[in-house]
Every structure is written in C-alpha cells, then in structure tokens.
Amino acid sequence: MIETAIYGKTVDDQSRCVHWHLPKDVIAIRFKCCDKYYACFECHQELSSHPLEKYDLLDDANKHLIICGVCRHEMTFAEYYDYNSNLICPNCRSPFNPGCKLHYHLYFQNPPPAMC
C-alpha cells in the first residue's frame, strides 16, 4: 500500500512540523488548491507558489480533508470533528491537539464555531 504524502516543513514522520511540533500535533489538512495534505497552514504558505483555496465544509462534506499523521487514516471533517470531541483518532486512538479547533477558519470555509 502506498502511504499518503504529507507535505510541509516536517520534523518527523507523524506530520509534526517546525511550526507545530508538540506530541499531539499529529494531523494534516488537505488544501483544495493543490489537493495535498500539509502539516499546517504556515507550511502551505511557505512551500507552495499558488494562492490558498479552502474546502467548503458544507459543499465538500464527503471528501477526506484530515489525515492522522500516526496511522494515515483519512477522515471527512465530520468524522474528525465527531471524534475530536474525544480528541483521538478513530482508527489508532492517537490523541489530537485540542487547540486545532481555534484554527479551523484558516483551513476551511464554513467551519463550526470554536468551542472551549
């Protein structure tokens, strides 16, 4: 099986990057403009040469937009968000960073409100 690539200024093979590298920083997000997973918004901005285009969470509800950097399980936003309430990957149970919800607006159109 071919492993899905995660782009960015990564510092390990679990999607952590120079910008976000705490133990729970193990997701990457697909960008509509290039259809690639990047470790973070900053990595995309620094490494791509095209304007950012975000997926719309209403129109693209069935598209895999999030990938777990640990097991490479791809998720729709709804699947990620449902399990994110537990802050874990639904496949490998790796913990996710709860602070990611504060940045949904950087990655998606029509994001849910960030709740503390």
UniProtKB/Swiss-Prot annotation:
Its main location: mitochondrion. A zinc finger (CHY-type) spans 10-94. It is found in: Mitochondrion intermembrane space; Mitochondrion membrane. InterPro entries: Mito_Tim_assembly_helper, UCP017292, Znf_CHY, Znf_CHY_sf. One of its GO terms (cellular component) is mitochondrial intermembrane space. It is a peripheral membrane protein. GO terms for biological process: protein import into mitochondrial intermembrane space. Keywords: Membrane, Metal-binding, Mitochondrion, Protein transport, Translocation, Transport, Zinc, Zinc-finger. GO terms for molecular function: zinc ion binding. The keyword Metal-binding applies. Zn(2+) 1 binds at residues 17, 19, 40, 43. PROSITE patterns: ZF_CHY. Pfam families: zf-CHY (PF05495). Zn(2+) 2 binds at residues 68, 71, 89, 92. PANTHER family: HELPER OF TIM PROTEIN 13, ZINC FINGER PROTEIN. Interacts with the small Tim proteins TIM8, TIM9, TIM10, TIM12, and TIM13. Required for the assembly or recycling of the small Tim proteins in the mitochondrial intermembrane, thereby participating in the import and insertion of multi-pass transmembrane proteins into the mitochondrial inner membrane. Probably acts by facilitating the formation of disulfide bonds in small Tim proteins. This is Helper of Tim protein 13. It comes from Saccharomyces cerevisiae (strain ATCC 204508 / S288c) (Baker's yeast).
